[in-house]
């Protein structure tokens, strides 16, 4: 005999381990699980742990060639979601060895990969991740961080002000640059390429970069302040993206921009490394986030995408407004804003923080309040976001 029986077997025999003591090096995940009718929560939680780590639907002889105990994910705690029928929070611990160092891409491929299409689950949402210092230390994180950015800009003790150039599509490069100049000359710290602006027929990227650089230098000379424009380097290939970042560096501008979800984490980490090596700040836009995070019972909460961005690298990230035109709950927003900026964040379920997170010395990211805000929102925004933020109007 081969020492095992073939056939479909229950996951909970192997992957549900309520007695497990989590290790400091484990990556911990909190999932909101909605099992199919008739599937017990233990089986559903164990299935999540299995499918996102070493498990497959049956036993195979090659299982005997490794130590599954060392490499398997473990569902170590399950609790019902208060106020929801047939929903459970399932906590899963993953051994550190399952993940490639310095790769957000690999981390997500494992934790939020095939398991989300799993038949035994009606829906699945990743609510939070605890990233241990042993793993976060394998990432560079933000190219510069909040403190270095303030030193570069020589602006302290207040939120930074920005606006997005509108109409976002259709202006020629020359007129676009003119709008940038007027905004910066009028007192803003930053202007921004809309995320839709890459390199379209009506305005190619190189022309835009040139006229925006001119606007920056002219307004700097006239105001005596350091100015910036988020030049969108997002492109169809990594090579093209880096080419745009190189051109921005050659122009001597202070900051470039990237859409990190549509561009992908591999491209984002590549760009962040380039920005760090070349003294460019990196502004991150989150186009596509609502596809992933808007459903309450399926997908991923934005706090997970925010943590992933801090690891991958970015100096600014759009993080909702609470008061503008787009959706966002106040307490939960404050929770992930702290996760972006602070070194050490205590577990606090009222703010959606499922785990205590210790970033040790990884630089912080400035949250950007953007999306349908105007001057009447100022008092609320400064109260919610405090000094370390970018208020992005328009």
Swiss-Prot record:
A GO-annotated cellular component: chloroplast
Annotated catalysed reactions: 2 (2R)-3-phosphoglycerate + 2 H(+) = D-ribulose 1,5-bisphosphate + CO2 + H2O; D-ribulose 1,5-bisphosphate + O2 = 2-phosphoglycolate + (2R)-3-phosphoglycerate + 2 H(+)
N6,N6,N6-trimethyllysine modified-residue sites: 5
EC number(s) from the headed UniProt entry: 4.1.1.39
Pfam family, one: RuBisCO_large_N
Biological processes, Gene Ontology terms: photorespiration; reductive pentose-phosphate cycle
Residue numbers binding Mg(2+): 192, 194-195
Residues the entry annotates as binding substrate: 114, 164, 168, 286, 318, 370
SUPFAM superfamilies, sorted: RuBisCo, C-terminal domain, RuBisCO, large subunit, small (N-terminal) domain
Marked site (Transition state stabilizer) residue numbers: 325
Cofactor: record remark: Binds 1 Mg(2+) ion per subunit.
Modified residues (N6-carboxylysine): 192
Keywords assigned: Calvin cycle, Carbon dioxide fixation, Chloroplast, Disulfide bond, Lyase, Magnesium, Metal-binding, Methylation, Monooxygenase, Oxidoreductase, Photorespiration, Photosynthesis, Plastid
Assembly and binders: Heterohexadecamer of 8 large chains and 8 small chains; disulfide-linked. The disulfide link is formed within the large subunit homodimers.
Known function: RuBisCO catalyzes two reactions: the carboxylation of D-ribulose 1,5-bisphosphate, the primary event in carbon dioxide fixation, as well as the oxidative fragmentation of the pentose substrate in the photorespiration process. Both reactions occur simultaneously and in competition at the same active site.
Family, as annotated: Belongs to the RuBisCO large chain family. Type I subfamily.
Name of this chain's protein: Ribulose bisphosphate carboxylase large chain
Source species of the chain: Alisma plantago-aquatica
Lineage start: Eukaryota, Viridiplantae, Streptophyta, Embryophyta, Tracheophyta
């Amino acid at each position: 005999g081969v020492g095992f029986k073939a056939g479909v077997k229950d996951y909970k025999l192997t992957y549900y381990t309520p007695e497990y003591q989590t290790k400091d090096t484990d990556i911990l995940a909190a999932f909101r699980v909605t099992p199919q009718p008739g599937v017990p929560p233990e089986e559903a939680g164990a299935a999540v742990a299995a499918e996102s780590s070493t498990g497959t639907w049956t036993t195979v002889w090659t299982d005997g060639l490794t130590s599954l105990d060392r490499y398997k994910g473990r569902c170590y705690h399950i609790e019902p979601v208060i106020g929801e029928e047939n929903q459970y929070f399932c906590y899963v611990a993953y051994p550190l060895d399952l993940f490639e160092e310095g790769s957000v891409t690999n981390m997500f491929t494992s934790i939020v990969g095939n398991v989300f299409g799993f038949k035994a689950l009606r829906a699945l949402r990743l609510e939070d991740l605890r990233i241990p210092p042993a793993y976060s230390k394998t990432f560079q994180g933000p190219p510069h961080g909040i403190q270095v950015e303030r030193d570069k800009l020589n602006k302290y003790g207040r939120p930074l002000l920005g606006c997005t150039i509108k109409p976002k599509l259709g202006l020629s490069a020359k007129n676009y640059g003119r709008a940038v100049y007027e905004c910066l000359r009028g007192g803003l710290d930053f202007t921004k390429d809309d995320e839709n602006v890459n390199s379209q027929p009506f305005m190619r990227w190189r022309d835009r970069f040139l006229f925006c650089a001119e606007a920056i230098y002219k307004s700097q000379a006239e105001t005596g302040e350091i100015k910036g424009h988020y030049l969108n380097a997002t492109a169809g290939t990594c090579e093209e993206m880096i080419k745009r970042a190189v051109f921005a560096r050659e122009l001597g501008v202070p900051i470039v921009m990237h859409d990190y979800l549509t561009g992908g984490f591999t491209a984002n980490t590549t760009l962040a490394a380039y920005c760090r090596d070349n003294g460019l700040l990196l502004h991150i836009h989150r186009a596509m986030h609502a596809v992933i995070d808007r459903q309450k019972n399926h997908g991923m909460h934005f706090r997970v995408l925010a943590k992933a961005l801090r690891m991958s690298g970015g100096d600014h990230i759009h993080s909702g407004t609470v008061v503008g035109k787009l959706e966002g709950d106040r307490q939960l927003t404050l929770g992930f804003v702290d996760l972006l900026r602070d070194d050490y964040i205590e577990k606090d379920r009222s703010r959606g923080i499922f785990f205590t997170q210790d970033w040790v010395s990884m630089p912080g990211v400035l949250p950007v309040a953007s999306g349908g805000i105007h001057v009447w929102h100022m008092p609320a925004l400064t109260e919610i976001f405090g000094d370390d933020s970018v208020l992005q109007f328009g």
